[in-house]
């Protein structure tokens, strides 16, 4: 993370390439198969940062917002062919990587946690229900949506 006025081009390119370009071309590749079959479900990974913002996160916030918008855009193209595309947008989730990051930046972790109304960070298992729902026939009439699994993070603004 860096302030927008000093963000390095190579860091910007890495963030946007990984998240936007990577997601787009994954959709394109799997979409070829699904379009042939006439059915499929794609669940893209967004973030609460695609809806809200924070200092020194502009490229990441932009990329995650772009994923949600891209999912909506492609869903309008492929829905007539039976393809549903949605975005799952989690909040801060406890992983080996995030634990190390939060330990090295405790004030940052505290700030994020203060925005999660359920009072704790998510665990990967917290995202399972939404992912299973989006992958199941229970969501057959849902496309182009973003599901926030965030413990109230986005509700707080």
What do the predicted segments below correspond to?
Residues 2-7:
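Short, small-residue-biased leader/transition segments that mark boundaries at the very start
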Residues 8-25, 39, 43, 60, ...:
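Catalytic Tyr-X3-Lys loop
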Residues 27, 63, 71:
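Active-site helix of classical SDR
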Residues 32, 76-80, 140:
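Alpha-helical segment proximal to the catalytic Tyr-Lys
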Residues 49, 53-61, 73, 100:
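Active-site loop-to-helix junction immediately N-terminal to the catalytic Tyr of the SDR YXXXK motif
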Residues 52, 132, 143-157:
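Short C-terminal tail/terminal secondary-structure segment
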Residues 80, 92-116, 156-157:
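A glycine/serine/threonine-rich, flexible loop-to-helix segment
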Residues 116-127, 138:
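A conserved structural motif in NAD(P)-dependent oxidoreductases
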